[in-house]
């Protein structure tokens, strides 16, 4: 009887500890570009023309060829191509301060490309106001981005978002975004380059 009581207490303690861990994981996000969100607001409100090629996923054979090209670049070559901030963010996995990036509050329609290799990554129609101070999107363009496990913060595993072509660090993705994907791709402005689109003429 005593053994059964001790087992019940141990099980209850384990469930309680796991609940506290989940709570901490959710509430400690604000300092790492991953604050819980209120109702997101889509930032693309006007109808604009869009060429199909500008926001299309790259074919696998094209991606592979470009991967080989960019994989051969040395760190010094990247430094020559990028500004110090761009290099820090994309090649050293840095994070810009919230509410300081060029695109965090941008409502300009267009396609956001990788600043390193010009691969189209996100369409402005998937951009929304996350309230975090970083540009946020709910869906990438095709397979032009990929994710991998980031264990750089102890007890807080995250999913890093990188360019599928040149492996540039873009930001992180979280499961608190809007419909239809429920994803929030929280990115650094310095990793992006906006190709703005012109209004459709009547």
Swiss-Prot record:
Residues of the active site are: 186 (nucleophile)
- How would you summarize where this protein is expressed among tissues? Expressed at low levels in stems, leaves, floral buds, flowers and siliques (at protein level).
Catalytic reaction annotation: L-methionyl-[protein] + [thioredoxin]-disulfide + H2O = L-methionyl-(R)-S-oxide-[protein] + [thioredoxin]-dithiol
Q: Changing residue 132 to C does what?
A: Decreases activity 6-fold
User: Which cofactors?
Assistant: Zn(2+)
Q: Name one GO molecular function term.
A: peptide-methionine (R)-S-oxide reductase activity
- Residues binding Zn(2+): 114, 117, 163, 166
Segment Disordered: which positions? 48-67
Q: What induces it?
A: By photooxidative stress.
InterPro entries, from UniProt?
Met_Sox_Rdtase_MsrB, Met_Sox_Rdtase_MsrB_dom, Mss4-like_sf
* Targeting presequence: 1-63
Remarks, anything else?
Lacks the conserved cysteine (here Thr-132) required for the reduction by thioredoxins (TRX) through a dithiol-disulfide exchange involving both redox-active Cys of TRX and MSRB. Reduced by thioredoxin CDSP32 which regenerates MSRB1 through the direct reduction of the sulfenic acid formed on the catalytic Cys, without the help of any other thiol compound. Also reduced by the glutahione/glutaredoxin (GSH/GRX) system via a glutathionylation step of the sulfenic acid and then by GRX reduction of the GSH-MSR adduct.
Name of the protein this chain belongs to: Peptide methionine sulfoxide reductase B1, chloroplastic
Annotated organism of origin: Arabidopsis thaliana
């Amino acid at each position: 009887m005593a053994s059964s009581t001790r087992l019940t207490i141990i099980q209850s303690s384990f469930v309680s500890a796991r609940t506290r861990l989940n709570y901490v994981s959710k509430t400690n996000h604000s300092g790492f570009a991953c604050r819980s969100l209120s109702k997101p607001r889509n930032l693309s409100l006007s109808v604009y023309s869009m060429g199909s090629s500008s926001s299309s996923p790259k074919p696998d054979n094209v991606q592979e060829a470009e991967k080989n090209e960019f994989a051969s670049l040395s760190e010094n070559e990247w430094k020559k191509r990028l500004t110090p901030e761009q290099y820090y963010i994309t090649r050293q996995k840095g994070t810009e301060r919230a509410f300081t990036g060029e695109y965090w509050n941008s409502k300009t329609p267009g396609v956001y490309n990788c600043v390193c290799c010009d691969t189209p990554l996100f369409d402005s129609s998937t951009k929304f106001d996350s309230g975090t101070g970083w540009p946020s999107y709910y869906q990438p363009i095709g397979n032009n981005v990929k994710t991998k496990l980031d264990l750089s913060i102890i007890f807080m595993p995250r999913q890093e978002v990188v360019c599928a072509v040149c492996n540039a660090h873009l930001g992180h993705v979280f499961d608190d975004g809007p419909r239809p994907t429920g994803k929030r791709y929280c990115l650094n402005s310095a990793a992006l380059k906006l190709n703005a689109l012109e209004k459709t003429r009547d």
